[in-house]
Amino acid sequence: MWRKPDLDAQYGLTAISTYRTLLAIYPNSPLRDAAEQRAAKLEQWFATKDYKTGMYYLRRKAYDPAILYFRDVIRLYPNTPKSRDAYLRLVQAFHAIRYREDERETCMAVRQLYPSDKQVGLACAAYADSTALPSS
């Protein structure tokens, strides 16, 4: 079975597909709660895998692939803890390559989702007022 998110995800893909099929075909199954929990755990693992790949590229200043992976985490796994982290790394990547409009839009989105988060506040301090102009 798939035990580490860093490794080949083929078994994880098969497992999550099986859980989703089970939930779709048997919505009132007594195994529903267990299947939902295991599917959620697998989603966290997939989010972690993509996030770590994005971090690999970000550390090497390969911003375009890093942005793609972070956007995938946000799009595919929005309910996982790594989604918030991916937003923060997107802000960091956009700032590094001076994509101010993308940085501002990402800050606006992450502030709506996590309004009282301190790290979000620090990462998006330049955009505390959504009407503020980006700094250069």
Per-region residue spans from a language model:
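Acidic, polar-rich low-complexity tracts and alpha-helical solenoid repeat scaffolds
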Residues: 1-136
